[in-house]
């Protein structure tokens, strides 16, 4: 075999992967949820400072390695021009980073033991005409409804994955906006939790689990114990949700509903699901009404900030919806032969065109 023919052989797989990785990093950063990463990096820095200063021991080596692997895969796939799989990997990395950073940071903030504000939050509800005790007993007296609300409340565990897969194809730019808005919302809600810590209405009104024998979710009674432990010296990281005000669950319900608008056909069911999830935040999550109002306001503010940032800083066009690609158009052309599906597609595309023109 001649030297020329030898040099023409394919490079080893690792060299190809390394070339894709190096080529993909700059473009991945341009296409990524950059603002979300900046917010998470700031939170990670604060977590490191507070952990050292307050004596928390936190060394998540396994999850950190998983995060690095996901980012490397995202960069390599970007370099290979597999942009939708790269988007999935990058978003999975953000979700991993969120789990790594946010619950431990909430634990550190709770341990700073700022004065509890339950009385003030309950008073705001009362001035809005809300009788929280009567409302809680009404839900208790309707156990079937409460059971449904509990299952809907838990949908925030699987909705991010469903939206990740659906929006990667249907509307990648909407996915990036939702991920970024969620990161900003988390940062703001943690800051609110630090300034206005609270245990929740079940604790404030002295309800016990015996008062709600059919309750499935016991976190409204466990959450005050976790917070009290941190406030009195415990240095164990808590990975359960302990933020009361503003309600991140309510904020995420609003952001999820907006995200589902970008999903053809089934998006309307996602919107309805999140309307119910927003309501379930009160009896199941144990939130004051003002928590929900503040959470919704934070979500809208965060979404506006995300839109403004990317509009001002993007240097390359966003990844287009799959329905506008060659493969997507062929698929839609085949579906248009079916009258019912054709009507749904036309309606969805018409709505998407209006939203694009408005943006």
Q: Which sequence ranges carry the predicted segments?
A:
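Membrane-interface loop-to-helix entry segments
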Residues: 145-159, 240-261, 289, 293
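Membrane-interfacial alpha-helical segments at the cytosolic side of multi-pass membrane proteins
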Residues: 162-169, 250-267, 297-308
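Interfacial helix-loop-helix junctions of multi-pass membrane proteins
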Residues: 200-202, 244, 276-302
């Amino acid at each position: 075999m001649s030297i020329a023919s030898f040099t023409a052989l394919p490079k080893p797989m690792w060299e190809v992967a390394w070339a894709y990785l190096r080529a993909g990093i700059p473009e991945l950063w341009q296409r990524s949820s950059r603002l979300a990463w900046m917010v998470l990096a700031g939170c990670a820095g604060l977590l490191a400072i507070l952990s050292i200063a307050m004596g928390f021991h936190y060394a998540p080596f396994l999850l950190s390695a998983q995060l690095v692997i996901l980012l490397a895969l995202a960069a390599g796939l970007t370099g290979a021009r597999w942009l939708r799989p790269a988007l999935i990997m990058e978003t999975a990395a953000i979700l991993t980073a969120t789990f790594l950073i946010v619950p431990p940071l909430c634990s550190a903030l709770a341990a700073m033991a700022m004065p509890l504000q339950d009385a003030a939050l309950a008073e705001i509800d009362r001035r809005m005409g809300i009788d929280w005790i009567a409302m809680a007993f009404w839900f208790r007296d309707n156990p079937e409804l409460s059971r449904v609300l509990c299952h809907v409340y838990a949908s925030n565990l699987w909705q991010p994955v469903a939206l990740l897969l659906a929006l990667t194809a249907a509307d990648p730019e909407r996915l990036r906006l939702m991920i970024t808005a969620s990161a900003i919302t988390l940062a703001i809600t943690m800051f609110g939790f630090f300034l206005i810590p609270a245990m929740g209405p079940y604790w404030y009104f002295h309800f016990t689990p015996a008062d709600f024998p059919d309750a499935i979710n016991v976190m409204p009674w466990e959450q005050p114990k976790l917070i009290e432990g941190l406030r009195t010296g415990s240095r164990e990281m808590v990975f359960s949700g302990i933020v009361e005000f503003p309600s991140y669950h309510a904020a995420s319900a609003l952001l999820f509903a907006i995200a589902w608008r970008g999903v053809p056909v089934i998006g309307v069911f996602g919107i309805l699901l999140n309307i119910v999830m927003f309501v379930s935040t009160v009896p199941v999550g144990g939130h004051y009404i003002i928590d929900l109002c503040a959470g919704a306001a934070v979500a809208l503010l965060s979404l506006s900030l995300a839109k403004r940032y990317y509009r001002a800083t993007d240097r390359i066009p966003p990844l287009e919806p799959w329905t506008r690609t060659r493969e997507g158009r062929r698929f839609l052309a085949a579906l248009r032969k079916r009258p019912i599906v054709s009507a749904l597609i036309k309606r969805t595309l018409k709505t998407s065109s209006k939203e694009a023109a408005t943006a």
